[in-house]
Regions:
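Feature captures hydrophobic
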Residues: 1-167
Length: 168
């Protein structure tokens, strides 16, 4: 059985958080963000779940915990299941702030998340390219590392397991 709250935290911080690494490591992602004229931020606020703000500039992407009051685009989400549906592409997010900047979501943000999907769910053929294989490995490592942290912090069994691990 899937714990939708734990999955939402994993999707927020591990999956969307990997956009930071993608924008730093991948030439195609760098090309996508190179068109950004001034920094733009997108905040996701999940009721009874995670909230974070992603800020994009031509120099990269940064994720901050919580909703920045001065974010350009705010996307409130009713619950963790809806947020997981957004990540799966089954639910369409509706911004309550920044409707004039929706073009960023439809073009740049979508292009970045499509590229992230391409990197994280590669074809066998793509993995034959050593540079792509390296990018996939680095992004996967980052995603898994953060996912483990979220599971340890959010999931009941994960919390129990984490509590039995000696610090250090």
């Amino acid at each position: 059985m899937t714990d939708s709250r734990t999955l939402a935290y994993t999707n927020m911080y591990a999956v969307l958080g990997t956009l930071e690494n993608l924008c730093e490591l991948d030439d195609k992602a760098k090309e996508i963000i190179s068109t950004i004229e001034k920094p733009i931020s997108v905040a996701f606020d999940v009721k009874n779940g995670p909230s974070a703000t992603l800020t994009f500039s031509k120099n990269g992407c940064r994720m901050d915990d919580g909703v920045n009051a001065d974010c350009d685009i705010k996307i409130p989400v009713a619950n963790c299941d809806k947020f997981n549906g957004i990540i799966d592409g089954k639910v369409t997010p509706i911004p309550t702030k920044g409707l004039t900047k929706v073009n960023f979501l439809l073009k740049t943000f979508t292009a970045l998340t499509d590229r992230l999907t391409e990197v994280m769910r590669p074809s066998e053929e793509a993995l034959k390219d050593t540079d792509f294989f390296r990018l996939n490995t680095l992004c996967t490592f980052y995603t898994v590392s953060v996912a483990l942290s979220q599971i340890g912090n959010q999931d009941a069994i994960g919390k129990f397991s984490a509590s039995n691990i000696v610090d250090g």
